[in-house]
Amino acid sequence: MAFLKKSLFLVLFLGLVSLSICEEEKRENKDEIEQEDDEQSEEKRALWKDILKNVGKAAGKAVLNTVTDMVNQGEQ
């Protein structure tokens, strides 16, 4: 009977250890996926920042040219 108890405890212990290892791997995979998502969102933010910066420059130049033309026409 004692032999069966020891065997049962050994099986349960090994099962818990393998379950623990699987859970740890799941957490690591989840963390890696979240990190990749964070990196992608940072890249998107940087891209939008560049786009908005270029649009702002173009709009500023257009306004400056329009105002300059209006001033030049007023002087003539």
Swiss-Prot record:
Expressed by the skin glands. InterPro entries: Dermaseptin_dom, Frog_antimicrobial_propeptide, FSAP. Its main location: secreted. It is found in: Secreted. Pfam families: DD_K, FSAP_sig_propep. Keywords: Amidation, Amphibian defense peptide, Antibiotic, Antimicrobial, Cleavage on pair of basic residues, Immunity, Innate immunity, Secreted, Signal. GO terms for biological process: defense response to bacterium; innate immune response. One of its GO terms (cellular component) is extracellular region. Transmembrane segments: none annotated. Residues 1-22 form the signal peptide. Residues 23-43, 75-76 form a propeptide. The modification Glutamine amide is found at residue 73. Belongs to the frog skin active peptide (FSAP) family. Dermaseptin subfamily. Potent antimicrobial peptide with potent activity against Gram-positive and Gram-negative bacteria. Probably acts by disturbing membrane functions with its amphipathic structure. Has an activity of stimulation of insulin release, which may protect the species from being eaten by predators by causing fatal hypoglycemia. Has hemolytic activity. The primary structure of this peptide is identical to that of Insulin-releasing peptide from Phyllomedusa trinitatis (AC C0HLC4), and Dermaseptin-2 from P.tarsius (AC P84922). This is Dermaseptin-B4. It comes from Phyllomedusa bicolor (Two-colored leaf frog). The lineage of its organism: Eukaryota, Metazoa, Chordata, Craniata, Vertebrata.
